[in-house]
């Protein structure tokens, strides 16, 4: 009789554990589903794309950003992420056009009381500047950097903790520092300019508010 009682207690404990695990799983699933339902169209896909960007899976990231744009054609996070992924893949012309399209869209549609939108616009100019800088078009890069700083200097002050962890760089190059450097170099006679410093250029990171 005692062994039977002990056996029943063990069965009851297993049942309680299984029910608790099932309940936790259902709440987790429901939280994910609610997040997908409650989020604005395209946000879930953009978060997936951002994760892939951080993992260096640029083709996959473009797929998720395209999926976001399919349901929300003016999703600025998707537009920005897609442009960054194109640049990281070396598809420079497509990336530049994507940044320019984002800048044009925000310039004509942005409300003055939209600080997040202003941060994205500043990042768009900063990222296009980085693209042009890497491509050797330093005057155009400088113009983009200055425009980014004029719109929202704080938004392009430098990549945050996420980038420092992902890229292992505690002191990434900032837009302001790079703009000052280019401006100083362009003021020199052409044969004295040093506009490419590979170890410093490698510290430049894309900006995605």
Task: State where each predicted segment sits.
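Terminal, low-structured helical/coil segments at or just beyond the last alpha-helical repeat
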Residues: 2-12, 16, 157-209
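Flexible helix-coil transition and linker loops at the boundaries of alpha-helical arrays
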Residues: 33-36, 103-119, 154-165
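Alpha-helical segment of the N-proximal tetratricopeptide repeat
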Residues: 38-71
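Canonical tetratricopeptide repeat
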Residues: 47, 81, 120, 127, ...
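TPR alpha-solenoid repeat register
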Residues: 78, 112, 124, 157-158, ...
